[in-house]
């Protein structure tokens, strides 16, 4: 059945929906910062092979622990106009696991001076060699001014070119998550997901693997608990995450804090997506375990508290603000099975024109896969309702037939979810989608 756009009487147009604030909301608590004032810096020009120092990272829990490292060499022009410091870890824990996905951003100190952040590694490496982004390169990004209206970043107009996650692949400076044998590549960012089915995780891996994100199922996603505003904790070496989905489902990319100065936090030592100025929630995280692997060891983690907002996603680091908060887009899904029983799911997804359509599609697909997992002939009737900021809402209807259950790809092709992407990329004016409601009715054939 062809999808027909209709102006619905649901709900009233929204006239005020703040996307970003750099003043803590009433009742919110600022993250507790420890570790003292910013350390002295070791200039790249003073780095020499053979120097011995220590790095900080969380092996388990929330407390950073030191491990010994030794400088091997300085790799000139590793990236355009950027050098990388080659190090070797000399600690039994890291010699067993190698440089771990999730260790990105771990600060490295020599004689008490901050040299930089662990950011690069080899897949299938036999020795724990890694690359360090010099702190000078990271601090240079801190001076970059914010230029764009956050509302427009959430839904920018004028870009009708490549869209969504495939367009992000070109933004990565070096190889993906597991490729790159024989060359130094960005340490992957473990994407901790909970509340997702194995089928949806497989689709996430296919979509996000090329951009250096490794989806892995973990427990303890951060649920939405109104009125519970606990303070998080952050210090150099602690785990920090970029939250993409929260609620009944959770998706968080986890790395490590490198440097804190007032409300400014530098982390990762490389980009997450490489999309420049952007506004996504930051959380602190708990590390459950290191999972060693020949291909790519990684940290298993869960998010704890919202602590700030990502403001820059650049070549040498991500930059956050501890006083900032940003909103996410609610997605409510109701799935009614053949027997008439309805299951409801609530999640919130990050506001970013390249991310939001994919994340919303995954939330809807996961809800359907969880509520009706049968891989058989079925018809899904989909009613999608988009509440638009300052405009009348939009309602679209679809019917899908599949012989192998309802997948994320099929749902992503429905008119409602396609309209979400088209609205965010429309060339006429920025459109902010306040929320998405999807009703799915399943019939077996």
Which residues fall in each region the model found?
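Sec-dependent N-terminal signal peptides
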Residues: 1-8
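Terminal presequence/propeptide segments associated with secretion/organelle targeting
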Residues: 8-445
